[in-house]
């Protein structure tokens, strides 16, 4: 039953972004585990390199949904947790941003980790405005305090939002064209300035691939 429900959900997500669900291989395991692969092609890609000082940093959605969902699971509020885990793939927004973005990636390893990865690839730094970072309302409801809320929002990961850098002169156009609201959270600075939030260094913590 769990597998059938998963396949139904996977097919629905694929249909929403005009992709085709192909199938996969099955094996036995002590718990229900899914490993997915997406295959596609683009005319011109936007990678992690290319951000330049003066570009604006924009993100989609709100951060901390998955962190909040896990806490709701721990409280056995399963319906709320499952709702929070329902993400909309940002395919259309990615296509829109591709027309202007100088660098882009997703936030699945955490916003902080993504910013550091972009900074390393682009040989730049970032000056982020903490108050501008959009945080999920659900996280505010379960966080212990302001610092716990911030930690979960930027370091937990699994939010699957886009993080991109855009020339300042193109920002308004991208906001108007994007099917998903874009939030400006900071700007690109010189490499020697590092990655900071309100002038303080932002730790490079998030999901680490083994």
Task: Put a short name on every predicted segment.
Residues 176-210:
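Acidic, Ser/Thr/Pro-rich beta/coil linker or hinge segments at domain junctions
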Residues 45-46, 169-176:
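Short, conserved charged micro-motifs
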Residues 21, 54, 106, 164, ...:
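Residue-level signal for inorganic ion chemistry
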Residues 2, 85-157, 189:
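Active-site-proximal betaalpha loop/short-helix elements
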Residues 67, 72-81, 87, 97, ...:
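Haloarchaeal acidic low-complexity proteome signature biased toward cell-envelope/secretome components but also
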Residues 1-69:
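Glycine-rich anion-binding loops of enzyme active sites
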């Amino acid at each position: 039953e769990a597998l059938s429900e998963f396949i139904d959900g996977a097919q629905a997500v694929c249909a929403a972004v005009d992709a085709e669900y192909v199938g996969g291989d099955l094996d036995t395991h002590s718990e229900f585990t899914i490993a997915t692969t997406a295959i596609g092609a683009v005319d011109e890609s936007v990678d992690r390199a290319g951000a330049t000082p003066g570009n604006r940093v924009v993100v989609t959605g709100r951060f901390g949904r998955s962190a909040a969902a896990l806490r709701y699971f721990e409280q056995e509020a399963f319906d709320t947790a499952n709702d929070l885990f329902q993400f909309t793939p940002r395919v259309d927004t990615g296509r829109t941003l591709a027309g202007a973005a100088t660098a882009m990636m997703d936030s699945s390893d955490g916003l902080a980790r993504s910013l550091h990865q972009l900074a390393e690839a682009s040989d730049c730094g970032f000056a982020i405005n903490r108050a501008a970072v959009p945080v999920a309302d659900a996280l505010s409801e379960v966080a212990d305090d302001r610092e716990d809320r911030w930690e979960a929002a930027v370091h937990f990961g699994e939010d699957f939002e886009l993080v991109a850098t855009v020339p300042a002169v193109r920002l308004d156009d991208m906001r108007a064209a994007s099917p998903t609201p874009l939030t400006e959270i900071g700007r690109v600075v010189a490499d020697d300035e590092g990655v900071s939030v309100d002038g303080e260094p932002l730790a490079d913590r998030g999901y680490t691939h083994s």
